[in-house]
């Protein structure tokens, strides 16, 4: 049986935590930032966790993580 390929885009976006979850970066922080408040941008800088409903999809993209 052949090896399963890792989705490289997903490997760059998600990191597995010690408890088995996945951490991710928040979106909306690349461009069009002048209309967003400093508080909003500051909160978007922090990492977030992948939701349980989406975790199955992330695991399918990262078979060896």
From Swiss-Prot:
Cited InterPro entries: Ribosomal_bL35 (IPR001706), Ribosomal_bL35-like (IPR021137), Ribosomal_bL35_CS (IPR018265), Ribosomal_bL35_sf (IPR037229)
A cellular-component GO term for this protein: cytosolic large ribosomal subunit
GO molecular function: structural constituent of ribosome
Compositionally biased spans, kind Basic residues: 10-26
Species, as recorded: Mannheimia succiniciproducens (strain KCTC 0769BP / MBEL55E)
Annotated protein name in UniProt: Large ribosomal subunit protein bL35
Keyword terms: Ribonucleoprotein, Ribosomal protein
One matching Pfam family: Ribosomal_L35p
NCBIfam families, A to Z: rpmI_bact
Segments for region (Disordered): 1-26
């Amino acid at each position: 049986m052949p090896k399963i390929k890792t989705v490289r885009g997903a490997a760059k976006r998600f990191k597995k935590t010690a408890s088995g979850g996945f951490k991710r970066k928040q979106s909306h922080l690349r461009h069009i930032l002048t209309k967003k408040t400093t508080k909003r941008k500051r909160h978007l800088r922090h990492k977030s966790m992948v939701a349980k409903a989406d975790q199955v999809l992330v695991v399918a993209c990262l078979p060896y993580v």
